[in-house]
Amino acid sequence: MTLRTLILAAGLGTRMKSVLPKMMHPLCGRPMVLLAIEAAEAAGGGKPVLVVGHGADAVRECANGRAEFVEQPELLGTADAVRRAEGLLRGTADKVLVFYGDMPLWKPETLRRLAEERAAGPLVMLTGIAADARMFGRVIRDAAGNVAGVVENAHLTAEQKSVREVNLGAYCFRADWLWEMLAKVKPSPKGEYYLTDLVEMAAHDGGASAIPVDDEEEWIGINTRAHLAEAEAALRRRINRRWLEAGVGMQDPSTVYVSLDATVGEGTMILPNTHLEGKTAVGRDCVIGPNTVLRRSAVGDRCRVECSVVEDATLEEDVSVGPFGHLRRGAYLERGVHMGNFGEVKNSRLGAGAKMGHFSYLGDAAVGAGANIGAGTITCNYDGQQKHRTEIGAGAFIGSDSMLVAPVKVGKGARTGAGSVVTHDVPDGELVLGVPARKIRKAGAKSVKRGRR
């Protein structure tokens, strides 16, 4: 039997107290609407249909062609929202699966089970046993134990308030029955049309079936910032369990934050208070953290990043950074680079084996293989109007507190004395020092004490 999926996402989200539409709020780095679409895709049925209202343009743009859309201009209830999609869906499938976009944590196997259930009646729904059922409509059963209807919390009788089985707002309808019965749903005293009325209709027309869902984390509904935080914590636990099962170590998983788009290699250890954000890729056998943020960056095998922030940067294999390093957009550290404490690199490439021990800034620079950047070195790359490049050759030795005033080139094997202000190019193998820096002799001359900075 063929299937289509419908996601209800037209709510105002006023309790979120945010200018951002509710469906655009992120969970572990991904907007809620994309999580809902991915859940629908996993259930089958091709491109889902979203019923949207507030923030419709932003939701459409975020979906990027992965869904079809209908609008619900007035919020007249969930049955009215489904009716808005009839023109798109009628005649396209035998079954219609419906769920709420603000309950985006359904596991693929749960929705597939709902979609594939073979029921005698026209409706199958998901239910759960809630410790606190006040947020949900209660599932009312008849004397034989069959589903008889759903009663919202405000309308419960004293006897019904003891019911703990709740309606989870996810349904699979026989399509022809759905479109026929929607027209028969009567308005509530508030003038709204509720999808839950169809449960009672189905109970009198072949029966409504219920599938229990035990994992309460799947059915977290998001209406407030507190709900959003609860859902994010649940999704984070799910993500971390997956990486632990894949051979990634976490000293304290409760303090590790890995985005849905991040990847981590086997054997890597992630220490407490570490964030892997966006499309970050970490290789095998690394140690990341503690207190580290990797944002949209690539980290090769066997790297060590400690107490540092790495943004839009690339680290090849066997690189060490930190503690307290900051790699900014365009930083590229080749194999075996060491960047010590309190260093910053922006839009610069450091060649294989280069060392930048501490307290240095490299911006808009190219550093050759094996070069040594002494403590306190700064590339003075901005003249007040535009940025300029600095080039440091392979094997160069930059003395402590050197100021390299760009644009400038320091040649291969060249050296600068401590405290030098380099305003002109330094040829290969030469030593310069002073303010401004002047040539003294070839860097290899015997009177120069190698190793001093």
What are these model-derived regions, one by one?
Residues D57, E61, G65, W106-K190, ...:
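Conserved core of the sugar-phosphate nucleotidyltransferase
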Residues R304-R453:
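Glycine-rich hexapeptide-repeat left-handed beta-helix
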Residues M1-S18:
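N-terminal nucleotide-binding beta1-loop-alpha1 segment
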Residues T2-R4, R30-E116, P407:
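Conserved N-terminal catalytic core of the sugar/cofactor nucleotidyltransferase
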Residues A9, V52, Y100, T127-G128:
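Short beta-strand/turn micro-motifs composed of small residues
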Residues L20-P26, E71, V185-S188:
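Short glycine-enriched, charge-decorated loop/helix-capping segments at active-site entrances
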Residues L260-A298, R302, S308:
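Phosphate-binding active sites in nucleotide-utilizing proteins
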Residues R164-G265:
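Conserved alpha/beta core of the MobA/IspD/sugar-nucleotide pyrophosphorylase nucleotidyltransferase superfamily
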